[in-house]
Amino acid sequence: MRRIRVAGGEALLIDDSYNASVASVRAGLAVLAAQPATRRIFAFGDMLELGAEGPAQHAALAQDAEKMCDLVFCCGPLSNHLFHALPAPQRGGHFPDSTSLAPALRAAIKPGDAVLVKGSLGSRMGVIIKALTAGEQVS
């Protein structure tokens, strides 16, 4: 966890971008939910290597995200199943890839927010971390 500069102040960034499984996503969401924050934002990339169960596993995480997040951004074809299972007010945006998601997420973050970035390595969520921290890291 580290603080990043955003327009008008700072936000908390939780970088869990290296790997993702159903259990680790749920654990990450619990960490996000425990943070004192104005809003809790979840940036989620596909969990890869789930086989035929991939769509259902992604959709099942919507219940957790709905309870623990205020806003959800997704990228990749599998995360679309989670995204569309959420109530419309929680949908920040769905994008084809992390490169497309990064600027929209950056623009959405406000002072006092806590942001969890999570996805399988192949989802390239590290691109988002770089976009959020480039020359902006506070601590």
Predicted regions and their residues:
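ATP-dependent carboxylate-amine ligase
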Residues: 1-139
